[in-house]
Amino acid sequence: MKTRRRKPVKIRLDGDPILTTVCHCVIENEDIGQIVWALRQVIKRDINCVGVSANQVGYDKRIIAYRPNIGLPEIAFMVNPIIRNVTDDEDKFKEGCLSHPGRQKEISRPTGIVLDYEDISGKLHNGVKFNGFEARIIQHEIDHLNGKCGVAL
């Protein structure tokens, strides 16, 4: 029996056109296994990585992965995330980005968000609230799906 070896996942860097592309939605029953595998590998290999989007690993799909609890191994995935509401309160924080190594920028973001998204099994989650650093990570990754990166501006 042959074991298929996968190539190491490469992060797309500043200047790659996929980073400025608005990603396409995942459609029902679409196979996203390879994308989920790639996102998981990136987060697992870098303890400082708190989130990554599908286009950062070369896929034009609306999928993100992130660590809901920094320092713990758990990885959360969101498919087709949509921000439905944000809090009026904002805070500033110096953000970094895997696609812009060594660059950081102070970015102001809402402290809370309400999202609709699907999990990787296709189950819909509506009106889910996120606050604090978790909300910040999710917003940063959704920016990537929309072809934007605040760190690059």
Identify the meaning behind each predicted range.
Residues 1-153:
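Positively charged
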